[in-house]
Amino acid sequence: MNSIWARLRLASSQLPIGGYSYSQGLEAALDNGWVRDAESARTWLVDQLQLNLARFEAPLLAGLLRAALAGDWAACDAASERHRASRETRELAQESRQMGFSLQQLLEALPELDDAGRAWLARQDPPNLAAAWAMAARAWRLDAEEALSAWFWNWLENQLAVLMKTLPLGQLAAQKLASSLLPDLDRACAEALRRPAVEGSAAFGLALASMTHETQYSRLFRS
């Protein structure tokens, strides 16, 4: 099977894992006035890409992807636990668990994942999103770069959807913003594949946004 179909499937916002319900702190950044327009939105997204995702989140996922594809279940366990421990707030932890569980349910209902992958996924209680994403890559025969690029695109598309629902930002403006971010996305993905997985991150702004979102008066999103 052509891997482009599997990559598009994994990257799609139509993947039934509930990503549209979450903003990953962006809604709180909007409420606090840190993000006000397309320019400040771009600054927020580039900071997330360069300072958080490319340096910690994505290298950790890349390591988990490589371990899953190789069938190194001990390494999968270690990477999955690091990912679980790195969720700094209740909302971010719940988001990862809910989306991971939904992707697990999807993979269990489809024929592609092998017995070893199913057995490992079943031992997670429940799997976080990174763990389930790695098993989806194993099921659909995607290498680490393909699965990681799908993850980056899924993240960007979700963030743009949040902005279109919360800012005076139309579809054309969102596509212009996406065009301006593609080189940053490319660099972040390449950097993540080069970097070793590290033990922790220091995305204080994201953590603060997520914490304040828990008590935000009016919310559209669950994170």
Swiss-Prot record:
Keyword field: Chaperone, Cytoplasm, Nickel insertion
A matching Pfam family: UreF
Keyword Chaperone carried by entry: yes
GO MF terms, alphabetically ordered: nickel cation binding
Keyword Acetylation: no
Cellular component per GO, a single term: cytoplasm
Superkingdom field: Bacteria
Transmembrane segments: none
Compartments reported by the entry: Cytoplasm
Subunit structure: UreD, UreF and UreG form a complex that acts as a GTP-hydrolysis-dependent molecular chaperone, activating the urease apoprotein by helping to assemble the nickel containing metallocenter of UreC. The UreE protein probably delivers the nickel.
Record-stated family: Belongs to the UreF family.
Function as written in the Swiss-Prot or TrEMBL entry: Required for maturation of urease via the functional incorporation of the urease nickel metallocenter.
Protein's name according to its UniProt entry: Urease accessory protein UreF
